[in-house]
Amino acid sequence: MTIAIGQNQERGLFDLIDDWLKKDRFVFIGWSGLLLFPTAYLAAGGWMTGTTFVTSWYTHGLASSYLEGCNFLTAAVSTPANSMGHSLLLLWGPEAQGDFTRWCQIGGLWAFIALHGAFGLIGFCLRQFEIARLVGIRPYNAIAFSGPIAVFVSVFLLYPLGQASWFFAPSFGVAAIFRFLLFLQGFHNWTLNPFHMMGVAGILGGALLCAIHGATVENTLFEDGDAANTFRAFTPTQSEETYSMVTANRFWSQIFGVAFSNKRWLHFFMLFVPVTGLWTSAIGIVGLALNLRAYDFVSQELRAAEDPEFETFYTKNILLNEGIRAWMAAQDQPHENFVFPEEVLPRGNAL
């Protein structure tokens, strides 16, 4: 028998808090939870409050709440008024001066949701890092989640920071996001931007890879269970392989002539494609924030202007973009009092 002689290690307040935060419970808290739960709760609560009660009349000249007759698709928490610039719009700041009603009217809820939402997403990413470390696995889930964080921060924070004010960010609502997409197309020709193309390829490519992978696994399952359905056919602690990688490799080698040789390369590729797509699209949005242009084929525009019989899909799209700008600006920015005479509005074969 071995007897260890020594003193108990002194445990401070930090150790006690650490033990409590990492205690095994139904919903893990952890140190990341101190950031995640309050910010996510406040962001979600702010959005539900805004879409239910708060008007956008004072910022956009629009009705945007359930109280005013909107539905789930048309309700939104709209961006602050253009005159607010890039103010954080703190409730106790010089704009609202502690008046909650006025704070809602000038768009304070949008800034509240955007900032708390960003920190909530970061907290969720840190949560995945923390749990991965405790469980003893690699942190690739957290690395993958950096993609959505990059998109959110670039679209809702960095883009309006590069523009005149928070007004030009997307409002938090379904139809409001669609309006923002039309704005990006009309004012930035976003669909022809190579970073947008890479983003689309990444997201749709990731969906395709996911569908192919799921179907292939289902096709090559080992039938070593006698249960009634797939979900009960295997035990959680089984030591055997669930599906045949060799059979899957043979199948796709016959289909395409090439196939993934091992599971590591296959699953890394499934991680790499969509995350890279998200990051490239986020980089593209930062470029739009700086008003950078991409793929302006001026020679085609000049020839189309000189030759009425020459038109390409590109020149047609440019004409459509001009229409979006001319007709959208007056509606989208009523505070500017834009007036476009009929003779300056674009006209062409497509309009």
Curated annotation (Swiss-Prot):
Positions of a plastoquinone binding: 213, 260
Binding positions (chlorophyll a ChlzD2): 116
Cofactor note (record): The D1/D2 heterodimer binds P680, chlorophylls that are the primary electron donor of PSII, and subsequent electron acceptors. It shares a non-heme iron and each subunit binds pheophytin, quinone, additional chlorophylls, carotenoids and lipids. There is also a Cl(-1) ion associated with D1 and D2, which is required for oxygen evolution. The PSII complex binds additional chlorophylls, carotenoids and specific lipids.
Gene Ontology molecular-function annotations: chlorophyll binding; electron transporter, transferring electrons within the cyclic electron transport pathway of photosynthesis activity; iron ion binding; oxidoreductase activity
EC number(s) given by UniProt: 1.10.3.9
Keywords, comma-separated and alphabetical: Chlorophyll, Chloroplast, Chromophore, Electron transport, Iron, Magnesium, Membrane, Metal-binding, Oxidoreductase, Photosynthesis, Photosystem II, Plastid, Thylakoid, Transmembrane, Transmembrane helix, Transport
Compartments it resides in: Plastid, Chloroplast thylakoid membrane
Residues where pheophytin a binds: 128, 141
Chief localization: plastid
Xref: Gene3D superfamilies: Photosystem II protein D1-like
GO BP term (any one): photosynthetic electron transport in photosystem II
Family statement drawn from the similarity comment of this UniProt entry: Belongs to the reaction center PufL/M/PsbA/D family.
Subunit structure, interactors included: PSII is composed of 1 copy each of membrane proteins PsbA, PsbB, PsbC, PsbD, PsbE, PsbF, PsbH, PsbI, PsbJ, PsbK, PsbL, PsbM, PsbT, PsbX, PsbY, PsbZ, Psb30/Ycf12, at least 3 peripheral proteins of the oxygen-evolving complex and a large number of cofactors. It forms dimeric complexes.
Name recorded for this polypeptide: Photosystem II D2 protein
